[in-house]
Amino acid sequence: MSRTATIKRDTFETQIELTLDLDEQTPIKVDTGIGYIDHMLTLFAKHGRFGLQVDVKGDLQVDSHHTTEDIGIVLGEAFTQALGDKVGIERYGAQFVPMDETLTRAVIDLSGRSYLVLHAELTAPTLGTFETEVVEDFWQGFADQARANVHIEVLYGRNTHHKIESMFKAVGRAMRQAITINPEIKGVNSTKGRI
């Protein structure tokens, strides 16, 4: 069974085409028009061992908010579609990722219920032209459309770039753990019989 998804989203603010492959590390190609987000999505895919292609045209003349949030929405939707009925998946993932002086923890539950908890003090308001406050909007869109509990906590650190980068790496690794198929799991990993 192929666990892949291609999602297209067209609004007055963004045009996004995203292809996700959960099991094959196809070449990672990301072009969002925002260099920092390109870097973060590439890290997410590399450390999660996902195939990922993303092409975005956004209203960057306004700012990076719509583009960043909509990418999170589409990425979450792609995970939901690629996972299908979630039969046999671990469901949970938890990872700690250090980056120099920073340590971040990410914990995921692919429960079918959306919830985001994000604890991170991002002291730099921008990185280049990227507004760091939209990182939370990205993860909210992702959690909502992946229908997942997403808990991200930067435990400590100084550098805002390192904090955000460790988030993307930690969530990528936690998602890899959560989507892994375990042959010992019969059906779905829930007493309800569905997730």
From Swiss-Prot:
Metabolic or biological pathway, per its Swiss-Prot or TrEMBL entry: Amino-acid biosynthesis; L-histidine biosynthesis; L-histidine from 5-phospho-alpha-D-ribose 1-diphosphate: step 6/9
One GO cellular component term noted in the UniProt record for this chain: cytoplasm
PROSITE patterns to which the protein is assigned, alphabetical: IGP_DEHYDRATASE_1, IGP_DEHYDRATASE_2
Keywords: Amino-acid biosynthesis, Cytoplasm, Histidine biosynthesis, Lyase
Coiled-coil intervals, chain numbering: none
EC code: 4.2.1.19
Single biological process term from Gene Ontology: L-histidine biosynthetic process
Record localization: Cytoplasm
Annotated Pfam families: IGPD
Catalytic reaction(s) noted: D-erythro-1-(imidazol-4-yl)glycerol 3-phosphate = 3-(imidazol-4-yl)-2-oxopropyl phosphate + H2O
Enzyme kind, highest EC tier: lyase
Gene Ontology MF term list: imidazoleglycerol-phosphate dehydratase activity
HAMAP family: HisB
Family: Belongs to the imidazoleglycerol-phosphate dehydratase family.
NCBIfam families, A to Z: PRK00951.1-2, PRK00951.2-1, PRK00951.2-4
The name this protein goes by in its record: Imidazoleglycerol-phosphate dehydratase
Protein's gene: hisB
